[in-house]
Every structure is written in C-alpha cells, then in structure tokens.
Amino acid sequence: MEDGAARNVAPVHPRPGPTPKAARERRVGCRAMHEILQAIGSGASGDDLAALSIPESYRAAFVRRDETGMWDGVESTDKDPRKSLHVDEVATPDLAPDEVYLAVMASAINFNTVWTSIFEPLPTFGFLDRLGRESVWGARHARDTHVVGSDASGVVLRVGSAVRNWKPGDKVTVHCNHVDDQDPTAHDDSMLATNQRIWGFETNFGGLADLSVVKANQLMPKPAHLTWEESACNALCNSTAYRMIVSSHAGAMKQGDAVLIWGASGGIGGYATQYVLNGGGTPVGVVSSPERAELLRGLGCEHVIDRREAGYKFWADENTQDEKEWRRLGKDVRALIGRDPEIVFEHPGRSTMGASVFVAARGGKVVTCAATSGYLIEYDNRHLWMKLKSIVSSHFANYREAWAANRLISEGKIQPLLSRVHPLTEVGDAALAVHRNEAEGKVGVLCLAPEEGLGIDDAEFREQVGEDRITLFRRHGS
C-alpha cells in the first residue's frame, strides 16, 4: 500500500452483524496491530518494524457523513459527542511519498474534535471534499467517515520514498500543521500557506486511532522522559501558546510584560502561563473555580482571578455588553499588579473579547485564536483606536515554532498539562468532558498503549525535572 497509486477505498462502517468478509478483515487487522504492539513493546529494531505488515484496516474514532444532521434543532450545549463519535475499523489509506505510517500509542482531545463531533460551525466533510479535489493523494481524504484527532505520539512504522529525516522505529510526537512544503506560499510562514490545514480536523486520518498517515514535516522527537500519553497531549496547545506568547508572529512578549490569560488552567492557557513565567513576564490568570485557582498557583502563577467568584457579567443581555463590568475587571487586574496588561491572551471569543480590548494597556495587544464561546465578535472600537491597541490573530504554529515548543518540553522547561486519561473506546466521554469544560489542562486518550505510564526512556532526567512538576495536573485531576 506504500507509494502506489492512491485508492479511494470506502471505509468500513460500524454496522451490527458484520459480513463474514468484514469480520475476517477485522480479525486480520487486529492480529496485525497486535504484532505491531508486541514488537514496539519488546524494543524491536527499525528494520524489524519495517518488515511487519501494515493492516488493511485499523481501529479509529470517527464521525459519519450520513449523521451530520443528527443535531438539527439541538442547542450546542446539549449536543453529546458520545452519540456521534464512533470507534470501529476503517480502511487503511495508501502512503504518499512524503508521509509515514505511524503506530499511534496515545492521542488527546482538542476543541476541534469537539467541534467535529457536534458538526459546528459546519460539518467537516466539506473540508475533506475540498482536499479531495486538489490531488490524487488528496482524494484519499474524501471519505464518508472522518477519523479525528490533532495530537499524537507513537512510533514510525514505514516511510514514503521522499522522507529523508525519519526512519522506522523513531519515537515521535506529531504537530497538526498539515501543509505542502512544495507550495511557495508556505515558505515565509507556513501558517500563511494557501493549502494550510489542521490535521485530523481539516484532513482525514487523524490521531485518535491505532494507526495514522502523517506528513514527515509534522514529526518531532518524542520527549524521552515522558510517557506516551504525556507526550501526546502537548503539541497542539503548547505550539499554539508558544506562537501566541513568544513568537514574533504574534505576542512577542518581552521581559516584564504583564499578560492577562483567559482560561489559564485549561489547555492553551496552562501552557501560556508557563511561557509567561519562563520569559520573565507577569501572568494574571483567569479561572472558573477555587480548585482551578489553586492548580494555577501550583504552576507558579501568583495573580489569579476567579471569574465565577467575581461574578462578571460582560453581557447585560444577548445583544448588549456592559462596559461597567469591563471596568470592574480592569480594576481587579490593576489591584493585583498595579497596571494594565501589555498582552491579553484571548481565546474564549464572543463572551470576553469586548472586555479584553478594554483592559489591554495603551499600546498593548490582544492576541486571539479559537473563539470557543462564539466567533461573531463585538468590541468598542474607541478603546482600540484611541489608545493605539492592536488585535493580533494567531492560528496554531509553523514547523519551526512547533519544534521550538517541543524542544522546551523535551528539556523539561515546559510541563505537560495532562489531567485525565481515557481509553480510545471512551473517546466520546473524553470529548464530552472538554465540551462541558469539566477537565483542567488536557484530556489524553490511550490508543495502542495498553496502559498509562509506558514509554519513558530517560527515567534519570524525569527525576531531575521532578515527578511532582510533570504530574501536577494529573494528580489534581485524579
């Protein structure tokens, strides 16, 4: 199946009572994946791994094209990812020359998986169909099932003929910037590439599976001191926070800058807090409970605002914002640090953007992504232009930024934010926890890894970094 003509094989749908042929294929696929897992667990060489058969199908979490209307008329908060995320066998795609087959040991839940599962703001099959029209290799993605997931750690099994820097047996993590490195628009900043996509959201064959196909320029070395699940939970949120806070493409934080961080105990917020602290800044973290405030202080953030205790109501009603509440937030920030923040780390979107623009310092900036509470944004432009503030958009990270962020994880300078772990069979429960904001940090998912705690190759360095630091969120989430 490698480097051949692409085939657009129909996926194996989850149906009761599989046909004898489908049942045989499933048994063969399970045996092949079991052999792969055994080989990885026994420390097989790269040559031995390369000699193993790639199964015709593999277990994956996916949504179905014929179910995209299942939530019609249902409020977003009432949509249950457990009903739309299926775990079953799907057909293995052919391998493009610039890709690798990856045995996925662990993955993680991100908001884009929640969006995919509730088909908001629109079903992702439109993304897959558009990719399918671009090339023969793109056509593989246009299926009636969408395998989701934008984080992964695992082991390279096979490499395409154009892959130079990776080989079977390499232990890797995966960042989600899916871009054609032969596209000239990708070479100033690949996030500006005309064909830039997020893997597992705007492409098929994502990381919530036992197997994946991944572009070689998505691969990064797995941190040797972390487990599979700890390694898998970082790339999307850590790289996003790095670009928003550190990179010259977005935040470009300086030593001494104050940064207001919404959702500071969450996925990207927890990484942002660490980057501000490491860079000599002053984080002001906004959280939603005393427990999360305590967790944030455990990261080293001294200045914390519990928004529920404060009772901010930035919207007087569905259509009207309340400037008095913006001012109250500004006073609370100044009471903590004595001034307005130079940077506001903004990702909730509609619910907070008006307040973010208001509280940013004169000449400061609001760095924004995601808009998880709503993407139709309102703010008072007078507070922007009259005080020379700026709004800077940021979307994930380019390869260099993702690599730098991953290096800081590998050096023990940034810690994983894993708070809970589910098996792949419970991916719906994991996505529901994120949808309902029930989990701090990141929610991990075990794929091929049979249990937590596996994959540590440098126990000595792990001890140097400190078990308490690495597992802070995990212990809090237990």
Predicted regions and their residues:
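C-terminal hydrophobic helical "lid"/dimerization subdomain
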Residues: 34-56, 339, 354, 399-478
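A short N-terminal beta-strand-loop micro-motif at the entrance of redox/enzyme domains
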Residues: 36-53, 68-106, 144-147, 162-163
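Glycine-rich beta-strand-centered segment in the early N-terminal region that forms part
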Residues: 91-108, 121-184, 223
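NAD(P)H dinucleotide-binding glycine-rich loop of Rossmann-like/cofactor-binding domains
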Residues: 138-143, 150, 178-263, 310
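Hydrophobic/small residue at the entry helix of a nucleotide-binding pocket
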Residues: 240, 268, 351
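Adenosine-nucleotide cofactor-binding segment
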Residues: 277-351
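Helix-to-beta-strand junctions that scaffold the AdoMet/dcAdoMet cofactor pocket
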Residues: 360-361
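Rossmann-fold NAD(P)-binding glycine/threonine-rich loop
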Residues: 372-386
